[in-house]
Amino acid sequence: MAAAGGAVLLLVLATATSVTGQHDYSDALHKSILFFEGQRSGRLPPDQRLRWRRDSALNDGATAGVDLTGGYYDAGDNVKFGFPMAFTATLMSWGLIDFGRSFGAHAAEAREAVRWATDYLMKATATPNTVYVQVGDAFRDHSCWERPEDMDTPRTVYKVDPSHPGSDVAAETAAALAAASIVFRDADPDYSNRLLDRAIQVFEFADKYRGPYSSSLHAAVCPCYCDYSGYKDELLWGAAWLHKASRRREYRDYIKRNEVVLGASEAINEFGWDNKHAGINVLISKEVLMGKDEYFQSFRVNADNFICTLLPGISNHPQIQYSPGGLLFKVGNSNMQHVTSLSFLLLAYSNYLSHANVRVPCGTSSASPVQLRRVAKRQVDYILGDNPLRMSYMVGYGSRYPLRIHHRGSSLPSVAAHPAQIGCKAGATYYASAAPNPNLLVGAVVGGPSNTSDAFPDARAVFQQSEPTTYINAPLLGLLAYFSAHPNLAQSDLLYD
């Protein structure tokens, strides 16, 4: 049984491409970080490297009497959605925490990418028992095609508070601040302490006033970032990061006390801005596998079960498909968000397993840490060009990549090239154009193939496949950092250590 499973896994790892040249993971890492500069909102710093971008949304928050300038636009639009932005910051931080040394010369710019998000999240949580969770009217914004520098749609401010709870977005924000506090512990101790103090306050608010923000703010946040999985996973996720950042026993006790109540054992192999179940189990399992806390053994069992569902030919209950070209595939929009987030968990867990010198039990078979790393690396290589179309899905990497991405700022002339305002409906001409985008959003990874055929239309209108998001790139940073430091996993290690 083990041999058969290994053979299928080897087939998936080797399938559908003869392009096996070494990728420049360090260059891809640099570009993936650079992408975040293209997503910046607010007043841009003098060292801004994507020069076609200019200042934007300088009055955000003014209608509510608060300063909400800064932060990131989530994707190809001009709305600031707090839920995916917080998740983006959490995942960038996790990559730096686990693979910080592998970032090498790119560590400082990666920290700056985190700080751009956390500076905003600190503003969004400056009022006690309140989290400002969105700036902009998604429906009005999505009816326009205009540069962020020009946008004239309403910058409506949305918040959660005791009367309108949002435990999901608040707990994710707490997780982001806590994770970032670890990132800045040595580089900027004062900032680190402020991040952790705020994370503690925000989590207390999230836990005390329970409820989904999708109920409190349904008309504003749905369907774009409705929390379909509920808020319980975010409460555990936030507690896990606070435990990791503070080492306070109260968070350890909170996790164990609420493990069943908040659904930690639910067999869900999802991980993304909405659903944190798999991430919770992998993150907490590190405590067990690193020999720090046997108290969390149940989370390791959950993590093992989750990991097995991702391994082709090994699981008796696979929940993941792979395309003929070897791409991990889950039904829904923007498949690359699943590819990068699940690959990150595979890589992180493989390192925890390696430290403990153990394998993942999968029924009558088992998987080695190297097998997990191989699956993760195969996904990264697919993104960078080892796929049936022989194209990179990262803009600016390789000789062939998406040219017509679904992104307002990239597809419209820059302010330097076209100083006059391009109004809401005037941008439609550029949206419908078959011409390549005039501004290169370097490092952007698009949604990619949307089914198991490995097809990609490179069409601006097909946003499910052509739109980049911050939460596609966020987990990719850690992956690229690791493989830039460890590019060669011997072919003999494909199946077993």
Curated annotation (Swiss-Prot):
Signal sequence annotation: 1-21
Q: Which GO terms describe its biological process?
A: cell wall organization; cellulose catabolic process
Please tell me whether the keyword Secreted is annotated for this protein: yes
InterPro entries for this protein: 6-hairpin_glycosidase_sf, 6hp_glycosidase-like_sf, Glyco_hydro_9, Glyco_hydro_9_Asp/Glu_AS, Glyco_hydro_9_His_AS
EC code: 3.2.1.4
The active site is formed by 77, 406, 458, 467
Major location category of this protein: secreted
Please state where this protein is localized: Secreted
Q: Which PROSITE patterns match?
A: GH9_1, GH9_2, GH9_3
The record's Gene3D superfamilies line, in alphabetical order, gives: 1.50.10.10
* Taxonomic superkingdom: Eukaryota
**Record carries keyword Translocase:** no
- What family does the Swiss-Prot or TrEMBL record give for this protein? Belongs to the glycosyl hydrolase 9 (cellulase E) family.
Name under which the protein is recorded: Endoglucanase 17
Q: Which organism is it from?
A: Oryza sativa subsp. japonica (Rice)
